[in-house]
């Protein structure tokens, strides 16, 4: 795997996707960000099994491939990168992150241990709906105050989503 992109694009996507990664996962693979490069597209996936966040963005793909890296360490490296172009290269059991001024080598996790069900979920099924982030945020602000922050009554700790008349 080898690809080029700008630090601005990948920083934003990594910071978004890493929010879904659990700090104390049940399996080591769930502490990672799954990176898949295919035909000038990068797909980042992060999950704690309850929540899956994926980000897709265009890259200059040199060699397609996939890998799994520790989310916390990878996010920290992304924050430290100077602006400009960045090149990611798969070198054995490491991934090399290289800019004009810096170079990092991060140990990879075994991407084959990442739960395949998280990677194969369909985005546009008959049961899925798309809505604007602002609409979702406004709706959650209105009803989120009714959800209990404590686990004493587990049925009251979430927000119920329902789709009526395609709205």
Where do the language-model regions lie?
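Structural preference for solvent-exposed beta-strand-turn elements
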Residues: 1-167
């Amino acid at each position: 795997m080898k690809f080029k992109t700008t630090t601005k694009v990948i920083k934003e996507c990594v910071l978004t996707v890493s929010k879904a990664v659990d700090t104390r996962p049940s399996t080591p693979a769930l502490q990672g960000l799954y990176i898949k490069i295919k035909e000038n597209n990068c797909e980042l996936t992060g999950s704690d099994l309850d929540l899956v966040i994926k980000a897709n963005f265009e890259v200059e793909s040199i060699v397609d491939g996939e890998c799994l890296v520790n989310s916390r360490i990878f996010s920290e490296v992304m924050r430290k990168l100077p602006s400009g172009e960045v090149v990611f290269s798969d070198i054995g059991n490491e991934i090399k992150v290289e800019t004009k001024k810096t170079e990092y080598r991060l140990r990879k996790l075994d991407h084959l241990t990442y739960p395949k069900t998280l990677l194969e979920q369909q985005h546009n099924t008959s049961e899925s709906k798309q809505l604007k982030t602002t609409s979702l945020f406004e709706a959650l602000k209105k009803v989120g105050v009714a959800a209990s922050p404590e686990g004493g009554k587990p049925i009251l700790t979430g927000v119920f989503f329902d789709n009526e008349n395609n709205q």
